[in-house]
Amino acid sequence: MVSSLPKESQAELQLFQNEINAANPSDFLQFSANYFNKRLEQQRAFLKAREPEFKAKNIVLFPEPEESFSRPQSAQSQSRSRSSVMFKSPFVNEDPHSNVFKSGFNLDPHEQDTHQQAQEEQQHTREKTSTPPLPMHFNAQRRTSVSGETLQPNNFDDWTPDHYKEKSEQQLQRLEKSIRNNFLFNKLDSDSKRLVINCLEEKSVPKGATIIKQGDQGDYFYVVEKGTVDFYVNDNKVNSSGPGSSFGELALMYNSPRAATVVATSDCLLWALDRLTFRKILLGSSFKKRLMYDDLLKSMPVLKSLTTYDRAKLADALDTKIYQPGETIIREGDQGENFYLIEYGAVDVSKKGQGVINKLKDHDYFGEVALLNDLPRQATVTATKRTKVATLGKSGFQRLLGPAVDVLKLNDPTRH
C-alpha cells in the first residue's frame, strides 16, 4: 500500500520511520499522534506565512466551512453542527491543501478525551442504520489537536465485539499470514491477534465497485481474500494487489482521509476491521500485558528500584518468547541484542571449555552482560525444559531500566 502512494507521501512516511527508529516508542499510537500533530502545525505555519502570495493568485488557503445536509435543520442545530466541525480532530476529513504543501506518537488509556469516543460510537451506530451520515468539509483554521477515545481496558472482560465470528483453521492461517508483517499488529500477543482475525467482517465486492475513495473518512482496514484491486491517486493508477494483501491501515490509528481510491478489478472477497474494535483489542491487550508483567517485575530484586510507572513502561516494551527443551536461546560469541527475564522454566548457562557454569529458573535473568559492556555473548544459554521468557531489546534496555542498570552493573560477573 505504501508503494502506491505519491513520492511526497512516501517521503513523509520515511521521515516518520526515521523518528520511530530513533525513539523506539513503547506506545506507538500516542507517539504517532504526537508526531503527526506536530507536522500538521508545521504545515499550517507554512501555509499561513504564504497566505498573501496565494491570495494574489486567487487561491483560498483557509476557506470557511461548508456543510451538506440530507434534511433541513433549525438555525440552532446548524449552529451546533458548525461548532462541532470547527473543533473536530484534524485527521477527520479531507485536507484540501494536500497538494499545496509538500514535505521535504506515552499513552495512558485512562486519560483520554471522551469527545472522540462519543463521535466514534455515533458513527458506529449510524453505519448500522439506513440514515446517511452528514458530510462535513475540512476547516483549515480549526485547532490542531488530536483526540483519543476513552476506552476503559479494565472493563473489556465483558465486551463482545460486534462482528466476532470464529474462523476456520485454514482461514486463520491465511489471515494471520496477511497481517503478520503489518506494523499495526506486530506488538499483539497471539491471543489478541487471533481475536483481531475473528473480528474481521466478511464483505463481498463486485467487479468495478469502489471500495474506498481518496479523501473520504477512513474507518476500516481491509484484507483481500479473493480477487484483485487497483489503487488510484488523483485518478492515476499507481498499483495493483491481490489475495493476501491488505490496505487501509491508517484508518485503524485515527480518522485519516483515504490516501488513495481502491477499485475492485474482479469480484472480491474482503475481510474488514473497524477502528473502534481494533483500539479496544489493542488497549485491552496492553492493559492485560501490564497486569501480567507487573507481578513478574515486582518479584525480581534487581528491579525493585523501579516505580510503578517505570514498571508499566517496561511491561509495554517486553516481548514474549517460548523455548522448548534443548533449544539454544543465546550462543556464546554472538552479538547481544536482547535482555531476558524468565517467566517460567529452566535454563543452563555454559561456557566453552568449562561446561555448565550456572542454572537459572523462574524470575531469574540473563543476557545483560553483553548489553552493559557492549561485548559479544559471554556464554551459551540453553532451555532444559519448556521456558517462557520476556525479552527487552537493546534500546529499551538502555532507556527503560533506569536505576536498575546500576544494580545490574554491581552484579555483573565480569567485574568480579
Swiss-Prot record:
<dbReference type="GO" id="GO:0005952">
    <property type="term" value="C:cAMP-dependent protein kinase complex"/>
</dbReference>
<comment type="function">
    <text>Regulatory subunit of the cyclic AMP-dependent protein kinase (PKA), an effector of the Ras/cAMP pathway. Inhibits PKA activity in the absence of cAMP. cAMP activates PKA and promotes growth and proliferation in response to good nutrient conditions. Together with ZDS1, provides a negative feedback control on the cell wall integrity-signaling pathway by acting as a negative regulator of MAP kinase SLT2/MPK1.</text>
</comment>
<dbReference type="GO" id="GO:0042149">
    <property type="term" value="P:cellular response to glucose starvation"/>
</dbReference>
<dbReference type="InterPro" id="IPR000595">
    <property type="entry name" value="cNMP-bd_dom"/>
</dbReference>
<feature type="modified residue" description="Phosphoserine">
    <location>
        <position position="84"/>
    </location>
</feature>
<feature type="binding site">
    <location>
        <position position="377"/>
    </location>
    <ligand>
        <name>3',5'-cyclic AMP 2</name>
    </ligand>
</feature>
<feature type="region of interest" description="Dimerization/docking domain (D/D)">
    <location>
        <begin position="8"/>
        <end position="45"/>
    </location>
</feature>
<dbReference type="GO" id="GO:0046580">
    <property type="term" value="P:negative regulation of Ras protein signal transduction"/>
</dbReference>
<feature type="modified residue" description="Phosphothreonine">
    <location>
        <position position="131"/>
    </location>
</feature>
<dbReference type="GO" id="GO:0042802">
    <property type="term" value="F:identical protein binding"/>
</dbReference>
<keyword id="KW-0963">Cytoplasm</keyword>
<feature type="modified residue" description="Phosphoserine">
    <location>
        <position position="70"/>
    </location>
</feature>
<dbReference type="Pfam" id="PF00027">
    <property type="entry name" value="cNMP_binding"/>
</dbReference>
<feature type="region of interest" description="Disordered">
    <location>
        <begin position="65"/>
        <end position="138"/>
    </location>
</feature>
<keyword id="KW-0116">cAMP-binding</keyword>
<feature type="binding site">
    <location>
        <position position="368"/>
    </location>
    <ligand>
        <name>3',5'-cyclic AMP 2</name>
    </ligand>
</feature>
<comment type="subunit">
    <text>The inactive holoenzyme of cAMP-dependent protein kinase is a tetramer, composed of 2 regulatory subunits (R, encoded by BCY1) and two catalytic subunits (C, encoded by the 3 partially redundant TPK1, TPK2, and TPK3 genes). Activation by cAMP causes dissociation of the holoenzyme, producing 2 active catalytic monomers C and a regulatory dimer R(2).</text>
</comment>
<feature type="modified residue" description="Phosphoserine">
    <location>
        <position position="74"/>
    </location>
</feature>
<feature type="modified residue" description="Phosphoserine; by autocatalysis">
    <location>
        <position position="145"/>
    </location>
</feature>
<feature type="modified residue" description="Phosphoserine">
    <location>
        <position position="83"/>
    </location>
</feature>
<feature type="binding site">
    <location>
        <begin position="302"/>
        <end position="416"/>
    </location>
    <ligand>
        <name>3',5'-cyclic AMP 2</name>
    </ligand>
</feature>
<keyword id="KW-0539">Nucleus</keyword>
<feature type="binding site">
    <location>
        <begin position="184"/>
        <end position="301"/>
    </location>
    <ligand>
        <name>3',5'-cyclic AMP 1</name>
    </ligand>
</feature>
<feature type="modified residue" description="Phosphoserine">
    <location>
        <position position="68"/>
    </location>
</feature>
<dbReference type="GO" id="GO:0045944">
    <property type="term" value="P:positive regulation of transcription by RNA polymerase II"/>
</dbReference>
<dbReference type="Pfam" id="PF02197">
    <property type="entry name" value="RIIa"/>
</dbReference>
<feature type="region of interest" description="Dimerization and phosphorylation">
    <location>
        <begin position="2"/>
        <end position="183"/>
    </location>
</feature>
<feature type="modified residue" description="Phosphoserine">
    <location>
        <position position="4"/>
    </location>
</feature>
<keyword id="KW-0547">Nucleotide-binding</keyword>
<dbReference type="GO" id="GO:0005829">
    <property type="term" value="C:cytosol"/>
</dbReference>
<dbReference type="InterPro" id="IPR018490">
    <property type="entry name" value="cNMP-bd_dom_sf"/>
</dbReference>
<dbReference type="GO" id="GO:0097271">
    <property type="term" value="P:protein localization to bud neck"/>
</dbReference>
<feature type="binding site">
    <location>
        <position position="249"/>
    </location>
    <ligand>
        <name>3',5'-cyclic AMP 1</name>
    </ligand>
</feature>
<feature type="binding site">
    <location>
        <position position="258"/>
    </location>
    <ligand>
        <name>3',5'-cyclic AMP 1</name>
    </ligand>
</feature>
<feature type="modified residue" description="Phosphothreonine">
    <location>
        <position position="129"/>
    </location>
</feature>
<dbReference type="InterPro" id="IPR050503">
    <property type="entry name" value="cAMP-dep_PK_reg_su-like"/>
</dbReference>
<feature type="compositionally biased region" description="Low complexity">
    <location>
        <begin position="70"/>
        <end position="84"/>
    </location>
</feature>
<dbReference type="InterPro" id="IPR018488">
    <property type="entry name" value="cNMP-bd_CS"/>
</dbReference>
<feature type="modified residue" description="Phosphoserine">
    <location>
        <position position="3"/>
    </location>
</feature>
<dbReference type="GO" id="GO:0005634">
    <property type="term" value="C:nucleus"/>
</dbReference>
<dbReference type="GO" id="GO:0000785">
    <property type="term" value="C:chromatin"/>
</dbReference>
<keyword id="KW-0597">Phosphoprotein</keyword>
